[in-house]
């Protein structure tokens, strides 16, 4: 017996005016995640997913492009104001914030949330080239 065709309702996108942009900048990649105030992810973009591969993935320009892509997706949710939380030592820290600013958001605060150990794990040995 075949199941009757029932319409699947598409989930309506919520309207969020205030959001938080989490920029995770590593030495190899930059991940930009935009969440609401409660921490629920709205959209995200990476410099690797923006078409950059290899060593070009870790450039400031790739981080700026990733931030602009995430910002374009966030405008579909009606985001106007944004807090930016930057984590990590990567080269795309500042340019990702500039990319979010160029989309047209009103950036209310920029905070550095890089985790700093209080003498925790032993760091990796120094590179010898």
Curated annotation (Swiss-Prot):
It holds the Pfam family Ribosomal_S11. The keyword Magnesium does not apply. Keywords: Ribonucleoprotein, Ribosomal protein, RNA-binding, rRNA-binding. GO terms for biological process: translation. GO terms for cellular component: ribonucleoprotein complex; ribosome. Part of the 30S ribosomal subunit. Interacts with proteins S7 and S18. Binds to IF-3. NCBIfam families: PRK05309.1, uS11_bact. Belongs to the universal ribosomal protein uS11 family. HAMAP family: Ribosomal_uS11. This is Small ribosomal subunit protein uS11. It comes from Hydrogenovibrio crunogenus (strain DSM 25203 / XCL-2) (Thiomicrospira crunogena). The lineage of its organism: Bacteria, Pseudomonadati, Pseudomonadota, Gammaproteobacteria, Thiotrichales.
